[in-house]
Curated annotation (Swiss-Prot):
HAMAP family: SthA. The lineage of its organism: Bacteria, Pseudomonadati, Pseudomonadota, Gammaproteobacteria, Enterobacterales. SUPFAM superfamilies: FAD/NAD(P)-binding domain (SSF51905), FAD/NAD-linked reductases, dimerisation (C-terminal) domain (SSF55424). It comes from Shigella boydii serotype 18 (strain CDC 3083-94 / BS512). This is Soluble pyridine nucleotide transhydrogenase. Belongs to the class-I pyridine nucleotide-disulfide oxidoreductase family. InterPro entries: Class-I_Pyr_Nuc-Dis_Oxidored, FAD/NAD-bd_sf, FAD/NAD-binding_dom, FAD/NAD-linked_Rdtase_dimer_sf, Pyr_nuc-diS_OxRdtase, Pyr_nucl-diS_OxRdtase_dimer, STH_gammaproteobact.
Length: 466
């Protein structure tokens, strides 16, 4: 006689990964419950990560645009906003996103349970509810989508009012004039842009020898130059020895012997999976040192009835990929296998000011692979649309095979880069000879548009062939 469970599947976490899994499961007729630790759905992406930081970035970039536009501004009338004012804009966006996502679950009759989950045995969870009560839930299968949080080294006092991580920075109430950012990854670079855009002095401490080393080197160099030009001080190959919190700021002692002082510190060096409270040892699962789980191509853990998606499995740690992972895991969970798979070339969007976005191979990778590629470039300053809106900083670079004309990689630096990249991505994904740089020469673009950069870059690249 088959065992009777409360649910076919329980999803732990309501971020993009959990939402993708839950929606995929209910659409296939499964009885599903989603457990969310906090009062509102959406996870770290909606409340502390992607959404608030991008809303912040947008507000700051519009202020910069206004102040740099000679039509609207003069030296006696600069537009200024406090950090608190800009955070209010982010709060409005978060509330809209939360209401929308809550509606998804309600429309699809997907039960949301609030509390902290922990495993008792292979098919049983205990839920510690906010009112102090404890519920026991059973399910045939589970999806762990509990996300990640900023990594906290034990020798840094994050309770100090001037020491922030990428979550707590969103509750900053004072107006810093000088910020130290430790960690020059995506989050560190994005916040360096935001603070510098608000006229705050920024020291960016990079533990490596260049910014965002996974990017094409020209894109990384462009960001470094732009930071240098705007006044961000970057210190490469540095690690902290000691961090001291004072009444009026923070002092950082570096292993190289340097000392830095600023009004506050944003520690943005690494993230760790939210798995420590799940009691995974009770179901025979182990995490790595970063609290992450290993999974196979169908997102199954070492326990075949337990799946994991999103930040908790590490790379690529993108909201966009997490949603797709959840959808694929839901298919595998119900049908035993998944016909869908994550695409090979996942686009990267980095929301610095200006943006950076890329898809496919870098020049360095193609050179190492000995692929005979050629480069096509378009500078934004030569596009009519960019001239009209004053977006002169930026470039689009297309890498293509010089013999087959196949597009191998696209890299964009400049405003709207994360939108522009998808035009090229759509052509790269075409099968049966459809992936060719000649498409951009043979198609008609609206004029004037930023998309026209593809035609300019394609002509530039094809003109290099002989």
């Amino acid at each position: 006689m088959p065992h009777s469970y409360d649910y076919d599947a329980i999803v732990i976490g309501s971020g993009p990964g959990g939402e993708g899994a839950a929606m995929g499961l209910v659409k296939q007729g499964a009885r599903v419950a989603v457990i969310e630790r906090y009062q509102n759905v959406g996870g770290g992406c909606t409340h502390w990560g992607t959404i608030p930081s991008k809303a912040l970035r947008h507000a700051v970039s519009r202020i910069i645009e206004f102040n740099q536009n000679p039509l609207y501004s003069d030296h006696s009338r600069l537009l200024r906003s406090s950090f608190a004012d800009i955070l209010n804009h982010a709060d409005n966006v978060i509330n809209q996103q939360t209401r929308m996502r809550q509606g998804f679950y309600e429309r699809n009759h997907c039960e949301i349970l609030q509390g902290n989950a922990r495993f008792v045995d292979e098919h049983t969870l205990v839920l510690d509810c906010p009112d102090g009560s404890v519920e026991t839930l059973t399910a045939e299968k589970f999806v762990i989508a509990c996300g990640s949080r900023p990594y906290h080294p034990t020798d840094v006092d994050f309770t100090h009012p001037r020491i922030y991580d990428s979550d707590s920075i969103l509750s900053m109430h004072h107006e810093p004039r000088h910020v130290l950012i430790y960690g020059a990854g995506v989050i560190g670079c994005e916040y360096a842009s935001i603070f510098r855009g608000m006229d705050v002095k920024v020291d960016l401490i990079n533990t490596r020898d260049r910014l965002l080393a996974f990017l094409d080197q020209e894109m990384s160099d462009s960001l470094s130059y732009h930071f240098w030009n705007s006044g961000v001080v970057i210190r490469h190959n540095e690690e902290y020895e000691k961090i001291e919190g004072c009444d009026d700021g923070v002092i950082m002692h570096l292993k190289s012997g340097k000392k830095l002082k600023a009004d506050c510190l944003l520690y943005a060096n690494g993230r760790t999976g939210n798995t420590d409270s799940l009691a995974l040892q009770n179901i025979g699962l182990e995490t790595d040192s970063r609290g992450q789980l290993k999974v196979n191509s169908m997102y199954q853990t070492a326990q075949p009835h337990v799946y994991a998606v999103g930040d908790v499995i590490g790379y690529p740690s993108l909201a966009s990929a997490a949603y797709d992972q959840g959808r694929i895991a839901a298919q595998a969970l119900v049908k035993g296998e998944a016909t869908a798979h994550l695409i090979e070339d996942i686009p990267t969007g980095i929301y610095t000011i200006p943006e950076i976005s890329s898809v496919g191979k870098t020049e360095q990778q193609l050179t190492a692979m000995k692929v005979p590629y050629e480069v096509g470039r378009a500078q934004f300053k030569h596009l009519a649309r960019a001239q009209i809106v004053g977006m002169n900083v930026g470039t689009l670079k297309i890498l293509f095979h010089r013999e087959t004309k196949e597009i191998l990689g696209i890299h964009c630096f400049g405003e709207r880069a994360a939108e522009i990249i998808h035009i090229g991505q759509a052509i790269m994904e075409q099968k049966g000879g459809g992936n060719t740089i000649e498409y951009f020469v043979n198609t008609t673009f609206n004029y004037p548009t930023m998309a026209e950069a593809y035609r300019v870059a394609a002509l530039n690249g094809l003109n290099r062939l002989f």
